[in-house]
Amino acid sequence: MIEVLLFGIVLGLIPITLAGLFVTAYLQYRRGDQLDL
């Protein structure tokens, strides 16, 4: 049961981590565009 619980936690954290990285990269990209302008 512990393995299943850890597996569920990992599956839940992966999309959140990817979303966080995507948002961070997007904000830095927009910030770079604004600095260029």
Curated annotation (Swiss-Prot):
Disulfide bonds: none annotated. Keywords: Chloroplast, Electron transport, Membrane, Photosynthesis, Plastid, Thylakoid, Transmembrane, Transmembrane helix, Transport. InterPro entries: Cyt_6/f_cplx_su5, Cyt_6/f_cplx_su5_sf. The chain crosses the membrane at residues 5-25. It is found in: Plastid, Chloroplast thylakoid membrane. GO terms for molecular function: electron transporter, transferring electrons within cytochrome b6/f complex of photosystem II activity. The 4 large subunits of the cytochrome b6-f complex are cytochrome b6, subunit IV (17 kDa polypeptide, PetD), cytochrome f and the Rieske protein, while the 4 small subunits are PetG, PetL, PetM and PetN. The complex functions as a dimer. Belongs to the PetG family. Component of the cytochrome b6-f complex, which mediates electron transfer between photosystem II (PSII) and photosystem I (PSI), cyclic electron flow around PSI, and state transitions. PetG is required for either the stability or assembly of the cytochrome b6-f complex. This is Cytochrome b6-f complex subunit 5. It comes from Lemna minor.
